[in-house]
Amino acid sequence: MSEHHSKRALSLDDLVNHDENDKSKLQKLADNESSVRSDDNRPGAIENIVNGNNSNSDLNSNGVIEEDTDTDDDVGGEFTFDNGITFDYDKQDRFSPEKKRIQARKKDTSKTTPSISNESPSNSKESSVPVDPLSSNISATDRKDSSEEKPDLTGPELVKEPDTNEYKRPSIQSITNAEDTTYNDHKAAGMEKTSNKHSLPNILSDSIDETVTEEHKPKTETEQTITEYQQENKQKDNVNESNSEETHDIKNDNMNQVEKIFQEKTSTLSKKNSVKKDLELLNEISASSKPNKYKNTPIWAQKWKPTVKALQNIDTNDFKIDNSILDIIPDDDLTKSVQDWVYATLYSIDPDLRPFIELEMKFGVLLESKSPDRVNPPVSSQAVYTDMDAHLTPNVDETVFKELSKYIQSLSEITENAGKFNVIEAQTKDAVYRVGTSTQRPRFLRMSSDVKTGRIGAFIEKRHISQLLIYSPKDSYDVKLSINLELPVPENDPPEKYQHQTPVSERTKERVSYIHNDSCTRFDITKVQNHNKGIKSNDVEITHEIELEINTPALIKAFDNIMTDSKEYATLIRTFLNNGTIVRRKLSSLSYEIFEGQKKIQ
């Protein structure tokens, strides 16, 4: 090694700074070389290189530690200085084929390989330096043929001149000044780093800077070893990086496959349930999004709710309802009117004559006084007709008469009513005589005799007291209530006295009477033949009369006890009117059925 250094030519720095002391310059170069050798021989540095610490990012763009070459042989051992103090290295290998291949490789690698930038030590593990094909090629050629001469690649980066379109190196002075600045910066940075992990970049950067300044200095064995380690580590890093990326991709694929395996496959039912949940959520949102005026119904639009539920304490299993809060049934207005009318009429009669009164109800059509038409007052329910000019002729339709007779007969023959009805049939002839003088009120005497035997059954004076007309717009027939007095004729005025006189009217009656003792009512169904003796002819008119007569002794008793117990009187009159209502409605229903039947027959 000493022989090699003794034969060494002067460096470019010596050539440029030739005015300095030659001895001091040589001493400085010797010190630098010794420091590089001592650092290379340390095991720590080699260890860092083997471990793949890629912190040597301060190398040149080609990633190759260039060798120093002698220029004495090329120029005949003499140095020529031009005015620009430049040294043209291109003249040595301008026409060399190896130079062209190297330049072509530089262009390819500059396109495909990103430039190496100085990174902090903390990021040195993550970053990887790409392998330079130029450096690997040069190292391979060195191993194949060590005796072959190599072109000078230690020069600085080529610069293209615009005039000649030729690549030339910059001046020696600019190169040396830039290299000295880089050397000092790297050395200062290396002094600040104390970690053993980052010691290799400092050592390498210092050694590289020294080799750059000593362009003509030949490579030592240690430097060649470092270069080989660097190239191997770069290749390993690239392989490891590609392997790690492949491994990471494989792991990601496996994770995706596992996630896909465990993904729940939604069924049709689950989809429907999710749709229902979404709809419920939308409904809740829409309901909650309504303004307050739509949430709370105003008072005027709310339905009425009773505060107390009706009949809430009634036991339906043992249901028993009272007639009213007073446990009585108040009479309707019509019944009350009849009760008052009867009471007033009876009160007006002499108490000695009250036992001879007769309260009867007859059915017929209420006619106007001046026309044969039925009255038509503006009412829709049963009412008392107060027009005294109207009159009612007791008469019903023959067919209805017969049907009603059958109906009442059937009622009397029902087993449940056995003993409640007394039936009396009679055929009598009534002759009415007018008795009195012109100065007295006329009297009408009625003589009743049996048609078959001719025996006189009764001889009475009949006085008309009062009547009440009741109009029933919903029924076929109206009602007339009348109170009469049937006074017996005194014994000094016997009936034989009037047998030779001409009666005012004669009537032959075929009567069937149904006496219902429980209701104190007598039902007289009578077919009447009226013998009208006129001047021109002797006509006979047949009518069908239905009469209801109240039990007079019961009525007088109830009337006398009205001051102590008014219920008996009110009940008696009400019962009598109820029996009349039943008959009236039955007559109306029979009339309707008969009328509809006649229409069908026609």
Swiss-Prot record:
Domain of life: Eukaryota
EC number: 3.6.1.74
UniProt biased composition (Acidic residues): 65-76
Reactions mediated catalytically: a 5'-end triphospho-ribonucleoside in mRNA + H2O = a 5'-end diphospho-ribonucleoside in mRNA + phosphate + H(+)
Compositional bias (Low complexity): 48-64, 114-128
Stored Gene3D superfamilies: mRNA triphosphatase Cet1-like (3.20.100.10)
Cofactor dependence: Mg(2+)
Active site: K276
GO molecular function: mRNA 5'-triphosphate monophosphatase activity; polynucleotide 5'-phosphatase activity
Alphabetical list of Pfam families matching this protein: mRNA_triPase
GO cellular component, one term: mRNA capping enzyme complex
Keywords from the named record: Hydrolase, mRNA capping, mRNA processing, Nucleus
Chief location: nucleus
Uppermost EC category: hydrolase
CDD domains: CYTH-like_mRNA_RTPase
Localization in the cell: Nucleus
Bias type Basic and acidic residues, positions: 15-42, 88-110, 141-169, 213-222, 231-249
The keyword Zinc belongs to this UniProt entry's keyword annotation: no
Compositional bias segments (type: Polar residues): 171-181
Residue segments, region Disordered: 1-249
PANTHER family membership: POLYNUCLEOTIDE 5'-TRIPHOSPHATASE CTL1-RELATED, POLYNUCLEOTIDE 5'-TRIPHOSPHATASE-RELATED
Purpose: First step of mRNA capping. Converts the 5'-triphosphate end of a nascent mRNA chain into a diphosphate end.
Family stated for the protein in its record: Belongs to the fungal TPase family.
Subunit structure: Heterodimer. The mRNA-capping enzyme is composed of two separate chains alpha and beta, respectively a mRNA guanylyltransferase and an mRNA 5'-triphosphate monophosphatase.
UniProt name for this protein: mRNA-capping enzyme subunit beta
Taxonomic lineage from the root: Eukaryota, Fungi, Dikarya, Ascomycota, Saccharomycotina
